Amino acid sequence: MKPKIKYDLVDMLKYRRKHGTESIKDFCEKYLHPVFGYPDVDDNYELIIGKDPKICFAAHYDTVHTMDGMQELEISNSTVTLAKGSKSNCLGADCATGVWLILEMIHAGIEGVYMVHANEEKGCIGSKALVKHNPRWLDHCQVVISFDRMYQNSIITHQSGIRTCSDNFANSLSDILGMGHM
């Protein structure tokens, strides 16, 4: 039986992960390199678990922070927020949670193609580069589930003006998750 690795979501949220900064490099060294190895030429991380996985799980590791470094957080009633007086412009919870979920799924041995993209907040640069350099990278996958979100109760159907799923899929998923119709 493999030991339980506990990835620390709160610690992950402390990193301001603006693309190209020291704090994003530190984040990758601490959380992504030990699991994925080093990234491809476009700074994307990929790992395949299983013989013929049909599902791809995706997230991105950059944030819309405007500065480098660490941020202080407060935890109250199981809710994490920026500390009072914080100079940060965002918490960065959607992408940190996506990376955390992917790390936990990999550790649990869940079969799939795992992709963690770079520089998505600046116009999907990491995912576009992946498709440009390897247009057939997903041919064997039937489904892509991207752990990204907007606000607290949303299913994203478009990103950068590009449809990411049908309204029928979004409404069905919304019903399954108990969110009501979109």
Label the model's feature ranges:
Residues 1-11:
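N-terminal, Lys/Arg- and Ser/Thr-rich interaction peptides
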Residues 11-53:
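A non-catalytic alpha/beta surface segment that caps or lines the substrate-entry region
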Residues 18-21, 62, 167:
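Intrinsic-disorder/low-complexity, polar/charged segments
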Residues 33-42, 77, 175-181:
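Short secondary-structure junctions
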Residues 39-42, 57-59, 82-84, 114-116, ...:
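General beta-strand structural signal in soluble alpha/beta enzymes
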Residues 42-48, 54, 64, 96, ...:
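Intrinsic disorder/low-complexity detector
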Residues 51-111, 122-123:
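Active-site metal-coordination/substrate-binding segment of hydrolases
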Residues 87-91, 95-182:
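Acidic/histidine-rich catalytic neighborhood of metal-dependent amide-processing enzymes
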